[in-house]
UniProtKB/Swiss-Prot annotation:
The keyword Transmembrane applies. The keyword Transport applies. GO terms for cellular component: fungal-type vacuole membrane. Residues 120-130, 175-210, 263-318, 374-388, 439-485 are vacuolar. It holds the Pfam family ATG22. The gene is ATG22. Its main location: membrane. This is Autophagy-related protein 22. Residues 1-98, 152-153, 232-241, 340-352, 410-417, 507-528 are cytoplasmic. It is a multi-pass membrane protein. It comes from Saccharomyces cerevisiae (strain ATCC 204508 / S288c) (Baker's yeast). Vacuolar effluxer which mediate the efflux of leucine and other amino acids resulting from autophagic degradation. The release of autophagic amino acids allows the maintenance of protein synthesis and viability during nitrogen starvation. Belongs to the ATG22 family. Gene3D superfamilies: MFS general substrate transporter like domains (1.20.1250.20).
Length: 528
């Protein structure tokens, strides 16, 4: 064989690996493009409206349970409550949506823990891609089913939303865990093995920002189309459900390219999947009579692995700092969106079309924030990652502060509809920047080979706060029947997060993560 032939073969293999690395990143973009409208459009706008709408249709006046909520009898200022479980308990119609959010996140947390351990154990990028598609299909079909409910099926609405949100949680964790793997593989292919560690930081930030912007771009397209769909159904009770149907179809269709794009990051050795997984099993030798995998053990491994990861995280100072800060931040940022939608509908009496327009403004500015903050502002002013997060939080804290002003002034402080449009721009910029920066920061301080499990910790921290936040706001609204009081809660949380974030050192965290990955037991590392 001539040297020319050998060089041609080497070049062919190199080109193959580069193309595969590029396809993996494209597949990662497809994950964001397909699923982001669910959380940005459905969860943030349509589902809260549907839950409140169904609750109002089935609710009664708070001071007289014999009068239906939508009855013209009584004062327009009368608040409404919904009777649950044969009227054993009554909750505010706005609180009902918040309680369902809390329950959905609890279910999401349980399923994320169970699945993430299996994904890390299997260690195959292609398997992670299958997980993205499988759970995406179930989530998309559940979303489509929501659009077919009638307004008396309030428990079915809650149940389908819980399933869909649980599926989104899984693909969110698995998708985020693929980011550092794809970044490092891309750098290895481009430099043919060796690469500078500093390039990981910059490329991770760029790809994460592009992914976030693509996700918001898809959400923007969905919202614009939804505006026309809702306008065509103006005056109909099914106007919101038509928009939900479109979200479900979008999710289902655009995730399909991942089937062909996402593949293993290296040329794989031909090993049967069950053999590979068996070699990684935390319970070696425990298989059924047919020699197949014992899935009970694999499901429990997710919990065992998470417990071990929390033990490892205790050794990683900056991981713990980040998780504590993120618990506080997420409790406020994620809850404030759904609360604002409920507030706009209940207190400002905004139409569905107006709320979709607000959502469009939020999405457009989130796209700008995802690009401008990490790639331009942070670079121009030479902010560290932790400093960037702190400035975003300070920016976002103005939103609840402005809502609090409404207790003291009649002319402003979320007293008029136009104020919601202005705050949508403000909120969108902070949300986009936070989405891009937070993912990239955390991906830099997790031990290599434990991405899925540590991102499940990130998600559990996020979701744990999302269980607590809506639940507490729901209790507050039940007590006061005035959702404006929740702005005090949000502002306090954002202020509390600042001193915690001030302690974060990303360089130190990355160094500690690399050191920990070297001392992890062999059974806990991903096989390359």
């Amino acid at each position: 064989m001539s040297y020319g032939t050998i060089n041609d073969m080497n070049e062919s293999v190199t080109n193959y690996r580069i193309k595969k690395a590029q396809n993996n990143i494209k597949g990662w973009y497809a994950y964001s493009f397909s699923s982001e409208p669910f959380v940005v459009s459905a969860v943030s706008t349509y589902i809260p409206l549907l839950l409140q709408q169904f609750a109002s249709i089935n609710g009664v006046k708070v001071h007289d349970h014999s009068i239906p909520c939508l009855s013209e009898t009584g004062s327009d200022s009368d608040k409404c409550v919904l009777g649950l479980f044969n009227n054993r308990i009554f909750v505010d119609t706005s609180s009902f949506a918040l309680y369902v959010f809390s329950l959905s996140v609890l279910f999401q947390t349980i399923i994320v823990i169970s699945v993430s351990g299996i994904v890390d154990l299997w260690g195959s990028v292609k398997f992670k891609g299958r997980i993205l598609v499988w759970f995406g299909i179930v989530g998309a079909l559940s979303t489509v089913a929501i659009s077919k409910l009638n307004d008396t099926q309030i428990y079915s609405l809650a149940g389908l939303y819980i399933v869909a949100n649980g599926c989104f949680g899984v693909i969110n964790v698995v998708g985020n865990s693929l980011l550092p793997i794809f970044v490092k593989d891309s750098l290895k292919c481009q430099s043919q093995g060796a690469y500078e560690p500093d390039k990981v930081d910059s490329l991770t930030t760029v790809i994460s920002g592009r992914g976030a912007s693509l996700g918001y771009s898809s959400a923007l397209i969905v919202q614009i189309v939804s505006m026309f769909l809702v306008a065509s159904k103006k005056g109909s009770k099914q106007d919101v459900q038509v928009a939900v149907l479109f979200v479900g179809i979008w999710w289902f269709v655009w995730q399909l390219p991942m089937i062909w794009l996402i593949d293993d990051v290296t040329i794989p050795i031909r090993v049967d999947d069950s053999t590979l997984a068996s070699a990684r099993s935390p319970y070696p030798g425990e298989q059924d009579a047919l020699g197949q995998l014992n899935w009970k053990n694999y499901l429990s491994y997710g919990w065992v692995s998470l417990f071990e990861s929390f033990k490892h995280a205790r050794l990683l100072k900056d991981v713990m700092i980040f998780l504590i800060a993120w618990f506080i931040i997420s409790d406020s940022i994620t809850t404030i969106n759904s609360t604002a939608v409920l507030f706009s509908k209940a207190e400002l009496h905004m139409s569905t079309l107006n709320l979709i327009m607000i959502s469009v403004l939020t999405v457009v500015n989130a796209m700008l924030g995802a690009f401008m903050i990490p790639q331009f502002l942070a670079t121009k002013f030479r902010w560290t990652s932790s400093q960037t997060l702190m400035y975003i939080i300070i920016w976002a804290s103005f939103i609840p502060f402005y809502g609090i002003l409404g207790f003291f002034f009649n002319a402003f402080g979320l007293k008029h509809k136009f104020e919601m449009f202005l705050l949508a721009i403000w909120y969108g910029l902070s949300l986009g920047g936070l989405s891009a920066v937070s993912r990239s920061v955390f991906s830099l301080i997790v031990p290599p080979g434990k991405e899925s499990t540590f991102f499940s910790m990130f998600s559990i921290t996020d979701k744990g706060s999302s269980i607590l936040g809506p639940f507490l706001v729901g209790l507050l609204t039940d007590k006061t029947h005035n959702i404006r009081y929740s702005f005090y809660f949000f502002f306090l949380l954002l202020m509390l997060s600042l001193p915690v974030l001030n302690c974060l050192d990303v360089k130190r965290g990355r160094r500690e993560a690399e050191e920990l990955s070297q001392v992890l037991p062999e059974s806990e590392r991903r096989l390359d």
